[in-house]
Design a protein with these regions (language model features):
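Short glycine-rich His-centered loop
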Residues: 45-66
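Periplasmic OmpA-like peptidoglycan-binding domain that tethers envelope proteins to the cell wall
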Residues: 63-71, 220-221
Length: 262
């Protein structure tokens, strides 16, 4: 009788341990899904650089109707700034108007490089929690291609600090990509990708991402990209992804700084 009772007790103990393990696994899965493999702790405030791509003499890509990438980049960036103003975020804009950053005389290629170097200089000086560059894509070889995609830097050097920046950049990029997929709902599934052929990504000193918000070469997407409401939707989706990592709550507004005119 004692042996039988002991066997029953052992069996019940196994059942209890199994249920506990299942519950623990489920809880961990929910937590992992919340922050897209992020290792960062939630913050009380943040510093973010918003970098509207191109500007001034550099129009970036252009649509068939003449729409310049630089203009939509700025419009989306300003919408993103408005969203961030509702949170404890100190925002530094690389530009808030149609200007290039400190171009000097020279050929176009040289001037573009100087512009990018100045943007990167601002980011390096500020050392934000995140720098996000806003751009648009263009693929005239296939006008059916559409959808937003997020990129993050891949460094060639193996420094511990750089690896940490790259991992955090990847976390932000994956969170923003997922948010775009959920909030834009355009039927296009994309994966955040690493990229090492962008000057502004070279040897990162802080977390950085670049968001290609859509394709100017796709007529349907172009029509949406020119609409203020869609730009607001994109900005909201980008911020939702960023805040998935930062976990900020709406609160006291912080100052917006325009680095191009400071």
């Amino acid at each position: 009788m004692g042996g039988k009772t002991g066997a029953i007790a052992a069996f019940l103990l196994v059942i209890v341990l199994f249920v506990a393990a299942v519950l623990l696994w489920s809880e961990r899965g929910q937590m992992a899904g919340k922050n897209v493999n992020a290792t960062e702790e939630c913050s009380d405030s943040a510093v973010i650089v918003i970098d509207p791509g191109h500007g001034g003499f550099d129009g970036g890509a252009s649509a068939s109707d003449g729409t310049a990438e630089k203009d939509i980049n700025l419009q989306i960036s300003m919408q993103l700034k408005k969203v961030m103003e509702e949170y404890p975020v100190k925002v530094i804009m690389t530009r808030q108007e149609d200007v290039a950053l400190n171009p000097s005389e020279g050929n176009i290629r040289s001037m573009k490089r100087q512009d990018l170097q100045q943007r990167r200089r601002i980011i390096d000086e500020v050392q934000p929690d995140l720098a996000v560059s806003i751009h648009l894509n263009n693929y005239k070889a296939d006008a059916s291609v559409y959808g937003a995609q997020v990129f993050y830097p891949k460094g060639e050097q193996k420094r511990t600090d750089m690896e940490r920046c790259e991992q955090t950049s990847k976390n932000f990029a994956e969170a923003v990509q997922k948010s775009l997929e959920i909030n834009i709902s355009d039927g296009r599934e994309r994966t955040a990708m690493e990229k090492n052929d962008i000057l502004i990504f070279e040897n990162p000193t802080c977390p950085m991402i670049l968001v290609e918000c859509g394709f100017l070469s796709n007529q349907n997407e172009l029509n949406k990209l020119k609409m203020a409401e869609y730009q607001r939707k994109l900005a909201y989706a980008i911020w939702e992804g960023i805040d998935e990592i930062l976990c900020l709550e709406k609160g006291e507004k912080m100052k917006i700084i325009d680095s191009a005119n400071r």
